[in-house]
Amino acid sequence: MNADMKWLDDPEVFRVNQLDAHSDHCYYIDYADMEKSENPLMQSLNGQWEFAFSKNVMDRPENFYEENFDASSFAKIMVPGHIELAGYDKIRYINTMYPWEGKEYHRGAYSMESTGDEAGMFSEAEYNPVGSYIKRFDLSEQMREKKICICFEGVEEAMYLWLNGQFVGYAEDSFTPSEFDLTPFIREKGNVLAVQVHKMSTAAFLEDQDFFRFFGIFRNVTLKAVPEVHLEDVWLQPTLNKDNVSGRVSVKIKVTAPEGRKVAAHFVLKDRENNQVAEDNITLEEKDGSRVGVIDTEVGSVKAWDNHCPYLYHAYVELRSEDGEILEIIPYDIGFRRLEMIDKVIYLNGKRLVITGVNRHEWSAKTGRSISMDEMTADIDCMIRNNINAVRTCHYPDQIPWYYLCDKAGIYVMAETNMESHGTFQKLGAIEPSCSVPCSIPQWREAVVDRARSNFETFKNHTAILFWSLGNESYAGDDIEAMNTYFKEKQDGRFVHYESSFYDRNYEETISDVESRMYAKPYEVEEYLNNNPKKPYILCEYMHDMGNSMGGLGTYMKLIDKYEMYHGGFIWDFIDQALLVKDEVTGKEVLRYGGDFDDKPSDYEFSGNGIVFADRKEKPAMQEVRYYYGLYR
């Protein structure tokens, strides 16, 4: 198969040769390797890559992936990182408009009778920048003679991949991992990996989030050596029983192994002090070319997990040979909790759930959405310090470590799928859905369901996730309904959230378990709750913290005591989106917001809505948050 630039124009092509999404577990050959700082089965490709920038598809170095290609004219670029912050293209912040507004007329393929398939919209566009990356590497000794996969944790927005001159695959969805099998093309030494990243494709219609419009390889790139016997996927479902003192855990695994090879699977659960509290053998059966196993194990005495006491247990799945030799170990920390809705009120472990939350973009003043572990840890510490107990991952899945940090800290998560098509149905503030995407357009359905699938499969084991969110501000329709159906069929005990059913009440019963609103005034919340409400109420965005804001927070907080069905909400938002740059006059570093980069179209200072500045210093508004949220601590 050869790469086809026309895939950029086709909403029905969003992944080619990409491996199926699976749980975000780590795996090790034995317990000794598990204690090492670096996993010998992993090899990072982060660092310096060769790079060339082109203004569009026609100007790209077409054969740059060939092994004998002369890349002497290529520059150097650091991965992970945004291409714009390396000095290429234009830094641009936009809220709801698309980058082409006012310059080119685009409507989503099949969104209107007159549009058709929109062939050439992006593949032949005068402006659609391309980044061509080359990475040369040798396999580490521990990785050799094994199946090798590569994982791109985040590439914005569409990527083509080659290895040693051979086409490997294509992927969209900027914010979930894209994995490919490199085994047919890889060698021990002298590998040439080539990645071509396109700033816009049909995925652009689904990624109209309120943020700076960057592109490039902005998250980690890792080679993974896959053992001959390998746990491909694990789904751990711990549940706190009704008595609040005992629990059970369901374990579902998918294992790959050579035909005829006998493999045993064993589950072990230990507490914080490393005392074993449960164990069970997992019987494996052949299914669709893999081996699958399921157990449901009772645990006699457990400590419940919640925001006040985020107690985690150490779970292990061991794969062993016929004679008992350990072949692979998968560790995962899990917590026991019970989430339920009784009489339209949500309860966690038998207590009414109160959300004192915040929306959080991933952001660094120096590196944009390519953030560090230290910055993530600082955000968790800030939330705990200021009585914030929940986070909405607006409006895309975050880096994998963020979910582990939330598990450990007891921060409740509304895990949002990477989808926002705001600019297709709201124009200059008016709701006008005549060309809304994805809506009920069949050609877009599988693309958005795949985004839901990637979100679920990757993060399904995280105790902190209480809600799956279908996305943000993408109107309503059969395609959104199909996403909801996907989550519901999983029956994982979590609730599904979506706000934009508010715009089309025909779908309010089929695309959200909660009544969700943005910026509804307190009296509007009361109007809903006083008039035969159908669902519990959550403000997925409120208290827009732009400028000297947050003064009315106390009025909203009073509703928590007044109405059982009101569960609180998520402040907009956690951190300003601004970049540290050197001032041309003073030479000092200053924070610059949307519009400060001569970017047009732009929504200017609207990028600054945080309760912390972009350098993570707390704003005065945080005093209000700490006080009022603290009343419900």
Locate predicted features.
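Active-site region of glycoside hydrolase catalytic domains
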Residues: 232-240, 247-250, 328, 382-385, ...
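Active-site-adjacent substrate/metal-binding segments within catalytic domains
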Residues: 81-139, 143-151, 157-162, 169, ...
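Surface beta-strand/loop "capping" patches
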Residues: 228-259, 624-633
